[in-house]
Amino acid sequence: MAIDSYCIPNFSQTIDNRTIVNIFQSCKYRSQLSVCFLNDKSAADKFSNSMRQGSGTITFIIHAEDGEISEQLHSTFRSVSTMLLCGMQLFVFIVAPRNVISSETGKAITWAFRGSFIELRDHGRGEQALHDILEQFYRLSPLVNVPKMGMAYYGPTSFAELLSLSSKNKTSWRYVIDYSMFTRSALVGFASHMMDECSFANKQINVIGYNPPYVWAGLRHGVTTRFTEMSTPDPEGYGPIKLILPRLTGNVLLKKVKYVQHDPQKKLLCDDSVMFALSRNILYIGVYPATHLLDYNLKGWRMVAVDPKINAAWAETLKQRTSIDLVPISAKFEFNAQSTRDIVLKYFSGVPFSIIDDSWVEGTEDYEKFQELKQSYFEQLVMNGSTSKLRVSMISMKWNRTKDVKCRRLLALLPQPYGGSLRELRAYFHVNGAAEVNIKKSEVNSYMDKFTSLSISEQIGSQKFMHMLITNYGDALKLKTGRDKAIIASYSLSNAINKKERVLKFLSDAAKSETLIIFGAPNLNRVKFMIKSGIVLGSDVTISNDLITFKNASGKVWKDYGYTQSELIKSSMIEITIEQMLCISSSSYNGVGYFANSIYNDMFSWYVPEWLFEKYFSIQDIRLSPVALVKCFTTSIRNLCYVPHLTYYALRGSFVEKVLITNNVLNSSYLITGTSHSTFKVLSNFEVPSPAGVLKFKAGDDVNISGHLLSLVIAAHFVASPTLLWATHMKRMTTPVNLPKNLDKLLFFDNKIKNGMLEKWHSREEVVLAAMIVENYVAHILNGRHSIEIIQEITQVIYEKFNA
């Protein structure tokens, strides 16, 4: 049948605001991809077929029969990249041994496409356990990809709970929490990875703006956390910092940050997280079993563990799982001069250290006497802590007293976030604690009655009191910057209390001093486009100049300044996506994944300093490639509008021809081809003026303009799109580049490699010419529902980067 026999629709017939809104909404579930590595081809065949038939899952199988899988990776993941917004589960089986593709490389590739990494190569062919796991994947489809890009998960802990949330209309807010918690975890993982790459002497992160999971995420990545807050409400307790029995219904907890719970079985998690964040030298009394520490990366910490229940096997497990420098002592700590001499001074003489106490004895009367002994010992230890040999920083003591108690050097007496039913408190002794304070049993009883009456969520929120011990108060824009300094400023510095000029100067100074700083803020132009398209209601988000006012369903209102890419570029900051940061650190990431994104999160963009980019990210591999981001948007729109492949590429050729005609290029100098491999052929030499300088075309050239750039501009209307990062890579790849020797060659499967060189992608002319048609191109594809600001900002970056 001839092409003329078909009725071919065009974009203007089908693209309206509803189409734009649908694309934004499909972004919530973008990349429903799982990639499973296994050794059993027959199992892959069987379950691939079952998942296709049972749930409509789109499946692929890569089989490394000859030990080479680069071409299969290229063809498979190029196909996957077009389907990431299709709303269907994608499942790739890769049957290859680890000597062909390592787990580390497999994870990096999977996460580059925002997928779930599944490693099953520890199971042999035909093994029943393997079939049981794959059978479960088949039964749970399409929920197999929970979570994406992470090992643990913050959100609902079971599929049943996830589904029940949907019926209660709670999923929308949960998605915002889900992805924002993933974001914080990913930022910590990336910062930790780069601190190692940069050989930081001090692995401490300054986090601007309080949010509880940063502490937990930090310890999973071997870093300590310090928060910086402008101020905090009065805790309304006793003592020098008002944290002795702080008020449970006061402003501190009323203004607590919403977040998803940790494992409620791990009651010591919050207290120990704070203590390990305070010091890298820990004396842990009554440590056994310490299962809550096993997921931490404690490399760089030293812990003297004292407990009669510990043995060599326990110690070996803890060392292997956490990489901690462990001194196990299988004995009782006697809380006397001998313990001080034999343990404290022996291992901590002249070294700052902290003590965690979780020891106890059976029997109410005996336990009370035991606590008296401990309290007296700890008070004396703290008061002697100013000596050169004994430098105790903080002591956390298990507290469950049965009578009135007089304390010295008590800094805080706090409820345990997960210990409400135990009616147990934590006492913190410090040299700056109260000189003397009376703790009445009746007051403690009343306090614990109030605490146990709180909801579980409210009890868990009380960990904010503990986190006040690792919070500094003051102007975040006066933080010290420079080498060996790491700062995370996401969802915080953009707050309206921080004037934009000061923030941009702070970022500029930080970047110039080679501070490892990560900045996240609303993308002003994308938020404007969201409002214009009706994806966010005017009652929920409003803009006045560059000030954005947000209002959530509960009525809470907050204001942030929106930032543009061009503003951040002037401050030497380069945009990079959260997922790209995570791919870079995938080999060491030990944080959480996510199930779904949210429209709110897609309002934000993140930036890192230019010096970091130039030093570590100057050559693009799949981890930084836009291939997993850009093509799916254009493909989705094409499919919504039934625009044929032939028509789409002919359209690009038509726009290019208009540019050539406008610039008085003779039509005898070129031949428009308009295919996916060629835009036009040059028949005789000609030049075209452009904002980036003169473009020169030579007879015989086969010109293929950059489709990635065109697709990137479409994507930038919907999600964070790192234009400068990609443009810098693109300019570098206008000539062949040596294949980096320190990276797995498979990370470059989307490149053409010849004689150890990465072949060039596009010429300067092909990129700039694409930029010259991009406004008309996007206006046509989005049927006039595009953002001039987004387009102009991107093209300006291209012109400046490629200026001759």
UniProtKB/Swiss-Prot annotation:
Domain of life assignment: Viruses
CDD domains linked to this entry: capping_2-OMTase_Phytoreovirus
UniProt record, GO biological process: 7-methylguanosine mRNA capping
Keyword entries, A-Z: GTP-binding, Host cytoplasm, mRNA capping, mRNA processing, Nucleotide-binding, Nucleotidyltransferase, RNA-binding, Transferase, Virion
Protein role: Enzyme involved in mRNA capping (Potential). Binds to GTP and might have guanylyltransferase activity. Together with the RNA-directed RNA polymerase P1 and protein P7, forms an transcriptional complex positioned near the channels situated at each of the five-fold vertices of the core.
Main location: virion
Pathway: mRNA processing; mRNA capping
InterPro entries: P5_Phytoreov (IPR044310)
Similarity annotation: Belongs to the phytoreovirus protein P5 family.
Native species: Wound tumor virus
Protein name in UniProt: Putative mRNA-capping enzyme P5
Any one Gene Ontology molecular-function term assigned to this protein's record: mRNA guanylyltransferase activity
Location of this chain's protein in the cell: Virion; Host cytoplasm
EC numbers: 2.7.7.50
Catalysed reaction equations from the record: a 5'-end diphospho-ribonucleoside in mRNA + GTP + H(+) = a 5'-end (5'-triphosphoguanosine)-ribonucleoside in mRNA + diphosphate
Cellular component annotations (GO), alphabetically ordered: host cell cytoplasm; virion component
Lineage: Viruses, Riboviria, Orthornavirae, Duplornaviricota, Resentoviricetes
Enzyme class, broadest EC rank: transferase
Transit peptide as UniProt keyword: no
